[in-house]
Amino acid sequence: MQVILLDKVAQLGTVGDQVTVKAGFARNYLIPQGKAVMATAANIAHFEARRAELEAKAAEALSAAQARAAAIANLAAIVITSKAGDDGRLFGSVGVRDIAEAVSAAGVAVTKSEVRLPEGALRTIGEHEVKLHLHAEVNAVVTINVVSE
């Protein structure tokens, strides 16, 4: 199925690219998320008329994400307190929601979908490096210091 991308999609293309994808991927993900439209003659003409607007919108989103990444880089280590045992293991865990709330409270708005924890939730006290995926091209790293109550 031919679609025109309205946003940058990882490993697929950038704004304005006309790509061939599987029908289910287009119908169930790209089109409902507003990341693509069907590549019909009418949509191609409509897209060409809006190309400058969409590219400006994409550039604005990129610059906003870069500004947020710079603000995150200037943050000191963020402290999260949690109950822990004597051996340094937490009673529970610190998850993406806790990290997103702590970073947002520190002054930079972050949603839980932007927090990346590849090894799962944090379960020990100490300092942890957490990656934030702010944009398709922008990533940031924040230091989370988990301390015992």
UniProtKB/Swiss-Prot annotation:
Secretion signal, residue range per the UniProt entry: none
Gene Ontology process terms (BP): translation
Gene3D superfamilies with a match to the protein in the record: Ribosomal protein L9, C-terminal domain, Ribosomal protein L9, N-terminal domain
Entry superkingdom: Bacteria
One Pfam assignment: Ribosomal_L9_C
GO molecular function, one term: structural constituent of ribosome
Keywords in alphabetical order: Ribonucleoprotein, Ribosomal protein, RNA-binding, rRNA-binding
Stated family: Belongs to the bacterial ribosomal protein bL9 family.
PANTHER family: 50S RIBOSOMAL PROTEIN L9 (PTHR21368)
Function: Binds to the 23S rRNA.
Name of the protein in its database record: Large ribosomal subunit protein bL9
Organism of provenance: Glaesserella parasuis serovar 5 (strain SH0165)
